[in-house]
Design a protein with these regions (language model features):
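Glycine/small-residue-rich hydrophobic helix-like segments
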Residues: 86-118, 123
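Eukaryotic acidic, Ser/Thr-rich intrinsically disordered low-complexity regions
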Residues: 112-159
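Flexible loop/turn segments at the boundaries of HEAT repeats in alpha-solenoid HEAT proteins
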Residues: 5, 34-39, 64-74, 103-114, ...
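Single conserved hydrophobic/aromatic residue that forms the stacking wall/gate
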Residues: 1-11
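Alpha-helix N-cap/helix-start positions at coil->helix boundaries
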Residues: 17-19, 49-50, 89-90, 121-125
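Structural detector for internal amphipathic alpha-helices that build alpha-solenoid repeat scaffolds
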Residues: 20-31, 53-66, 94-102, 126-134
């Protein structure tokens, strides 16, 4: 497993598009949650767009809790995603995707990030769009999520 992880790190440095990045799911990742959490943080801090995106997608796949991932939910995931989103479209979209999935699987953990306007405006907008497009987010949650954006834009208009 350690050799495959090392080869995966080399391969990730060569990835130059979101589709290839999002398809990578080395089986070795699902073996050790503590080690994977450390690796995800390193990928998020790498400064390489698709390595950061891979870290975000991996957090989404493995650390959002029951029914969605191999490991218990990590309450630090929302803050990690916001910090990693940056200014690049592909990393912001991955963070928005993670937040939309978080609103499905860990609603109480992720919703305050929207209601308290803790997301940068563009990431908030992208998250709302991804959540509204999702078939897994129930209609009553979609209504609440939609209102977070309406409230935010109305507050911005008043200033």
């Amino acid at each position: 497993p350690e050799m495959s992880r090392g080869l995966g790190d080399v391969y990730k440095r060569q990835v130059d598009n979101w589709a290839t990045c999002d398809q990578m799911r080395p089986p070795a990742l699902g073996q050790d949650g503590a080690a994977l959490a450390v690796r995800c943080r390193a990928w998020l801090a790498s400064g390489r767009v698709y390595t950061v995106r891979f870290g975000l997608v991996t957090l989404m796949r493995y650390f959002l809790g029951a029914g969605k991932s191999a490991f218990p939910p990590d309450p630090e995931v929302p803050a990690l995603a916001v910090a990693a989103a940056g200014e690049d479209y592909y990393t912001r979209m991955a963070a928005a995707w993670l937040f939309a999935e978080g609103l499905t699987w860990q609603y109480e953990l992720f919703l305050p990030w929207l209601t308290d306007c803790r997301l940068p405006p563009e990431l908030h907008r992208m998250t709302v769009q991804k959540a509204l497009d999702s078939y897994r987010v129930p209609a009553e949650r979609k209504a609440v999520i939609r209102r977070t954006w309406t409230a935010r834009t109305q507050a911005a208009d008043r200033t």
